[in-house]
């Protein structure tokens, strides 16, 4: 009661003195009507009530009724204190001011703006003389310095402010700690009590008002307030200052908040709610505490109730620490905070204008994205936009709550999508504020703010960061408003057709749309006549039925296209449909698309874009199924690998089937011919048909790609003849000992349709491209290349047309050769010295290549040829120049018979009847006439051991009529040839890599490069070696230029050139 009575007496004396000096003041006249109950109620009022009083004041109303009566004095003060144009218009109503349309000449300094409104309120400031204002401003600026920094440390010594400005802070704080008593000899260290509720003011809290009142009343008047009674009370209450540090409320915008204390102190001591931890600071060494000691910091339980909170609760401790760190517990009694708050939107500043614009105006998308994209996401993994846990979704699926994850997202999408965008923007909006606070803390700890210049730069940086946060947070607020506007317009059915609210920002009041937009919307509704109809919630059953009906309609009515799909999304939808149709969209990529913002329509089945996507996909699928199905051909690399695998499989199969015993062979007089055996036609061709089926079936239809297992002859013959490019079926039974006899005319009549059906009627693009390449190669080198291509294209399915000269592809190839080189002349196919052909074969094989597949040649060999012979035959066909061929030429020439020309090769053996000879002739001719078994014409260059035709062989021993075929036993060298040619190693350059013996490899290692790392200074270059066959085209080492795709024909062309050079060198 003594403290309350002293406060009332002090306040009455101050008001009486002020009424004498400012008798004409309207504000002071209002202040003289203070009542005791108002003063008592001020101490216990909640902060929210005070703010309600502030907002309820006429100055903040939009009607414009509250106009300052003290602005003339304020304009005079501006002329004394601030340089620059006036930012205050003649009409002082906030509701009628447009901050966007004002021209702000320059930015006011924060110190000037904050110091305009002082603790006496707006009404009292207007009547101060300029000199009194300067004195009050000085006290406020001193308190501002102390308030903004000295929560953890005092800046007075860091910035070198002398005792003339701030007083001896260190000595006064040290005296307070040691003696715990007030020394009246130092006027700056005496506090007085002003709250009617009995709370005590700290020394720093009463600095500003006491300094100002001391200036107004004079030293003698103020000293009268500090009588013996008051001093005794102060000394008694001194023990409370270490724990209780609340300050009386100084909200001075209304008369009830004018609690003022007088204290004549020329050297103030600036503090803010110091705790015992802060009292331990030694200002000579300037130790910076990292936080407040919550255990010793006691606050009134009736206000915040910290003591009632369980200290063992982690979240309670976090809450208290955050409140103390941010200083929320000091706002209620913080005079400076109240002054700064009252200044907002009262004095015109560009900061307030831009803040209003950013919160109420939605920027254009490109400008908004520019602002947000300049701020990067925080590095901490927890400070990201939260996503729904995948484990939670899996739990829903396991429990059967939802069928798919998309079903769950469809349910939460109406609100979750908008909230995620708000969270994303909030994280970026607070990032600059975090940077400012963090920079201040680091500066204090590292003691970098040691001069006024450093302080000015730090303030400028902080101001810039705060502006960025204001703009970003304002656009986040505007985004939330836009979401609400869209949802409301969607509910009444006006979202897509009504004018956009973004063009009508509301700066007048807090309504969502604003009066201007509502008037415009009313006019638009009257002009358009569009009815307003509130949408009703659709039951789940009807929604599912509607979705099913829409899906059915999209699959049946291909021409129905939505009318209002966003044109910006149409291109994305078209690209997605093409990827789905072409099969280039994997399930993993499709899952990732659901999280891509560009493909948002995949998760919104009710959107027009999704409907357009479904209809477009159904239409594309329908058109795709109506087209002829063209299967994709294998790549050249796949063809090469499969050909190699097929050749290995055939070789291993022959090794298993052929016996290991050497047979004596019969030497024949015929110079050339096909090797034959007595086995049946099906047995002769079973191996060859299986192999040929793999290659030729793939080139004909592209569907037979799996290597079949070894089968019997009937299955092999049926499969061979079932292919579309094969000759007509043979009526003879393939399982018999020999083919059934038929007349030659029948053979001719069936061979002609076969030859007409064998050529591929539909020549695909790959075959055409291969034919063009080969034609250019042959025209460039010569016709000999064609012969070598025919002999060595067994394992290359892309050159199938060389063995079927009646095909359209071969004709196209010959036309291209003649077109590129008109003077070229090909060797005649009917030369007497190079071919052995029967009349029937002459009809069937007219125009066919001179040499067929070595694979067929292997198939026509006897089943008892030695593996060594088989391997050497294959090596000769691949290497084209082995010693075997050159040594066999003279033997074949010596064995040549003059009457060998014109005779047809058969499967008969001397001693057998003529019926078997005649019967086997058409069977073998027909088997070799089709594309499955193309005819082979034997020349002296490819004649090998055991290939002398059967009718020209000389019978040296008596043979039974039924026996196995025999071979001629030549005296062959036991050892391997000295100059045996191997397969060129440089053909495998695609699999070769540099080793540590390579000079370039060693150079790179010396330069610091390691295997597996990229080239370049930062290791961002290529990791794999550059292909040997790729041309650099001027690029430097390690340049990742366009890779040249090498197909099978390129490899084949290189092999042909090397073998051709080797062939000519061996002649």
UniProtKB/Swiss-Prot annotation:
Cross-link (Glycyl lysine isopeptide (Lys-Gly) (interchain with G-Cter in SUMO2)): 219
Claim: Transmembrane helix is one of the keywords in the record: no
Keyword check for Cell division: no
Signal peptide residue numbers: none
Sequence ranges assigned to domain G-patch in this UniProt record: 996-1042
Phosphoserine: residues carrying this PTM: 93, 206, 267, 586, 740, 838
Keywords: Isopeptide bond, mRNA processing, mRNA splicing, Nucleus, Phosphoprotein, Repeat, Ubl conjugation
List of residues that carry Phosphothreonine: 265, 744
Biased composition (Polar residues): 680-691, 825-840, 919-931
Motif Nuclear localization signal, chain ranges: 980-985
GO MF annotation list: RNA binding
UniProt record, GO biological process: mRNA processing; RNA splicing
Biased composition (Basic residues): 975-984
SURP motif repeat locations: 573-616, 770-813
Region annotation (Disordered) ranges: 177-199, 668-767, 825-944, 967-991
A Pfam family reported for this protein in Swiss-Prot or TrEMBL: G-patch
GO cellular component annotations of the record: nuclear body
Recorded superkingdom: Eukaryota
Gene3D superfamilies reported in the protein's UniProt record: Surp module
Database matches in InterPro entries: G_patch_dom, SUGP1/2, Surp, SWAP/Surp_sf
UniProt feature, compositional bias: Acidic residues: 866-883
Record field: compositional bias (Basic and acidic residues): 177-189, 843-856
Localization: Nucleus
Function: May play a role in mRNA splicing.
Protein name per its UniProtKB record: SURP and G-patch domain-containing protein 2
Organism in which the protein naturally occurs: Mus musculus
């Amino acid at each position: 009661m003594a403290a309350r009575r002293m406060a009332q007496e002090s306040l009455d004396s101050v008001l009486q003195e002020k009424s004498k000096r400012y008798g004409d003041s309207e504000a002071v006249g209002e202040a003289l009507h203070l009542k005791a109950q108002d003063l008592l109620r001020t101490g216990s009022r909640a902060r929210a009530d005070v703010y309600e009083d502030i907002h309820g004041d006429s100055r903040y109303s939009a009607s414009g009724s509250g106009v300052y009566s003290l602005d003339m004095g304020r304009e005079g003060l501006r002329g004394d204190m601030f340089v620059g144009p006036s930012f205050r218009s003649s009409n002082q109503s906030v509701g009628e001011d447009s901050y966007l349309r004002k021209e702000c000449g320059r930015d006011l300094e924060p110190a000037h703006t904050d110091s305009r409104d002082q603790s006496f309120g707006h009404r009292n400031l207007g009547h101060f003389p300029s000199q009194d204002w300067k004195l009050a401003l000085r006290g406020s600026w001193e308190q501002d310095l102390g308030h903004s920094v000295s929560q953890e440390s005092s800046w007075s010594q860091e910035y070198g402010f002398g005792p003339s400005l701030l007083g001896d802070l260190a000595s006064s704080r040290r005296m307070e700690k040691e003696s715990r008593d007030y020394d009246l000899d130092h006027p700056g260290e005496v506090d007085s009590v002003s709250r009617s509720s009995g709370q005590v003011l700290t020394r720093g809290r009463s600095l500003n008002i006491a300094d100002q009142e001391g200036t107004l009343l004079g030293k003698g008047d103020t000293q009268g307030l500090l009588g013996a009674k008051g001093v005794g009370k102060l000394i008694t209450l001194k023990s409370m200052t270490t724990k209780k540090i609340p300050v009386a409320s100084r909200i001075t915008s209304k008369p009830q908040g004018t609690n003022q204390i007088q204290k004549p102190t020329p050297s103030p001591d600036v503090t803010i709610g110091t705790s015992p931890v802060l009292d331990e600071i030694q200002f000579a060494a300037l130790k910076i505490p990292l936080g407040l000691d919550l255990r010793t910091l006691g606050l009134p339980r009736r206000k915040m109730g910290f003591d009632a909170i369980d200290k063992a609760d982690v979240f309670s401790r976090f809450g208290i620490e955050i409140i103390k760190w941010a200083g929320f517990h000091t706002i209620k009694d913080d005079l400076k905070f109240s002054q700064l708050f009252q200044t907002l939107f009262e004095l015109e500043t560009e900061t307030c204008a831009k803040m209003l614009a950013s919160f109420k105006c939605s920027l254009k998308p490109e400008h908004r994205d520019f602002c947000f994209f300049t701020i990067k996401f925080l590095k901490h993994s927890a400070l990201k936009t939260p996503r729904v846990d995948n484990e939670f979704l899996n739990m829903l699926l396991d429990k059967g709550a939802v069928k798919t994850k998309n079903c769950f997202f469809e349910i939460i999408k109406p609100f979750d999508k908008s909230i995620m965008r708000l969270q994303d923007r909030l994280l970026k909006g607070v990032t600059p504020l975090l940077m400012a606070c963090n920079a201040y803390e680091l500066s204090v700890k590292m003691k970098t703010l040691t001069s006024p210049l450093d302080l000015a730069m730090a303030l400028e940086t902080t101001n810039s960061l705060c502006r960025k946060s204001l703009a970003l947070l304002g656009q986040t607020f505007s985004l939330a408003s836009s979401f609400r506007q869209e949802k409301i317009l969607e509910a009444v059915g006006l979202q897509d057709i009504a004018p956009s609210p973004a063009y009508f920002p509301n700066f007048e009041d807090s309504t969502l749309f604003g009066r201007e937009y509502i008037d415009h919307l009313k006019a638009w509704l009257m002009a358009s006549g569009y009815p307003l109809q509130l949408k009703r919630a659709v039951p789940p059953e009807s929604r599912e039925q509607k979705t099913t009906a829409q899906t059915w309609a999209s699959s049946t009515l291909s021409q129905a296209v939505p009318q209002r799909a966003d044109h910006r999304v149409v291109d994305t939808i078209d690209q997605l449909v093409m990827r789905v149709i072409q099969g280039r969209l994997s399930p993993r990529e499709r899952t990732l698309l659901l999280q891509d913002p560009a493909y948002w329509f995949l998760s919104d089945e009710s959107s027009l874009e999704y409907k357009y996507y479904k209809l477009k996909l159904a239409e594309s699928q329908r058109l795709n199924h109506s087209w002829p199905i063209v299967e994709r051909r294998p790549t050249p690399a796949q063809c090469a690998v499969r050909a190699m695998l097929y050749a290995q499989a055939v070789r291993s199969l022959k090794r298993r089937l052929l016996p290991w015993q050497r047979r004596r062979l019969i030497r024949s007089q015929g110079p050339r011919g096909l090797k034959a055996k007595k086995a049946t036609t099906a047995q002769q061709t079973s191996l060859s048909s299986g192999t040929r089926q793999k290659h030729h079936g793939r080139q004909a239809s592209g569907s037979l790609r799996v290597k079949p297992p070894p089968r019997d002859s009937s299955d092999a013959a049926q499969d061979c003849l079932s292919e579309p490019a094969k000759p007509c079926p043979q009526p003879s039974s393939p399982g018999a000992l020999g083919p059934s006899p038929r007349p030659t005319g029948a053979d001719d009549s069936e061979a002609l349709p076969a030859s007409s059906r064998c050529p591929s009627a539909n020549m695909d693009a790959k075959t055409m491209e291969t034919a063009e390449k080969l034609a250019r190669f042959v025209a460039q080198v010569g016709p000999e290349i064609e012969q070598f291509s025919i002999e060595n294209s067994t394992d290359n399915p892309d050159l199938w047309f060389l063995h079927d000269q009646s095909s359209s592809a071969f004709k196209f190839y010959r036309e291209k050769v003649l077109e590129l080189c008109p003077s070229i002349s090909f060797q005649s196919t009917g030369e007497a010295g190079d071919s052995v052909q029967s009349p029937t074969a002459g009809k069937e094989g007219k125009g066919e290549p001179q040499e067929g597949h070595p694979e067929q040649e292997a198939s026509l060999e006897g089943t008892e040829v030695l593996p060594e012979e088989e391997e050497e035959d294959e090596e000769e066909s691949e290497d084209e120049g082995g010693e075997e061929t050159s040594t066999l030429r003279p033997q074949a020439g010596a064995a040549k018979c003059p009457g060998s020309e014109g005779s047809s090769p058969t499967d008969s053996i001397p001693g057998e009847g003529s019926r078997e000879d005649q019967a086997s002739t058409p069977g073998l001719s027909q088997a070799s006439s089709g594309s499955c078994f193309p005819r082979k014409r034997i020349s002296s260059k490819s004649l090998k051991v055991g290939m002398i035709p059967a009718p020209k062989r000389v019978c040296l021993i008596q043979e039974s009529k039924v026996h196995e075929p025999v071979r001629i036993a030549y005296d062959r060298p036991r050892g391997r040839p000295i100059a045996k040619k191997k397969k060129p190693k440089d053909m495998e350059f695609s699999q070769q890599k540099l080793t540590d013996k390579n000079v370039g490899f060693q150079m790179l290692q010396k330069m610091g490069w390691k295997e597996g790392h990229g080239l370049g200074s930062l290791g961002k270059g290529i990791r794999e070696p550059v292909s040997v066959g790729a041309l650099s085209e001027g690029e430097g080492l390690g340049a990742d230029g366009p890779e040249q795709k090498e197909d099978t024909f390129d490899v084949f062309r290189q092999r042909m050139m090397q073998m051709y050079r080797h062939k000519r060198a061996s002649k």
